[in-house]
């Protein structure tokens, strides 16, 4: 093979590699991301050591609401408008390249939708006057929260480990624009694979 052929092959391979990298970044910014769960706020649903989940990013882009009970990734910085740059820097691919972990992204369960009246009565969360049956929580909450009505364009989220979770009780209702996406699959550890 002559030098011209070797150069042509190398350029072709380089183009292929760049295309794969760009496609991976595109997918991880706009369609699907994976997240490591490494805090206790969603116990017992997710173990804080080594659980990995896949998140579908697009279901809420066009103003669609999550369902009550969905497990979502939210940006906890509720006092600022999210930008496309945030979506890019929140990508796990970019996080690995930049060697940083985004502490602002939380995994939580949707408890309330716009217009829902939430309150804490006798150790239980009530939504629109009815106590929630929450067989997924680790234990009853030690402390209550102020009654609230979830405003339009927002959701109310809480961790399943209520006594060790920072959530809407601390930052308030989360704007829909701060909802990254919905958890669709736990894919690791392999003995706990589960679709959501």
What does each of the following model-derived ranges do?
Residues 1-196:
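Extended hydrophobic leader/signal-anchor segments used for secretion and membrane insertion
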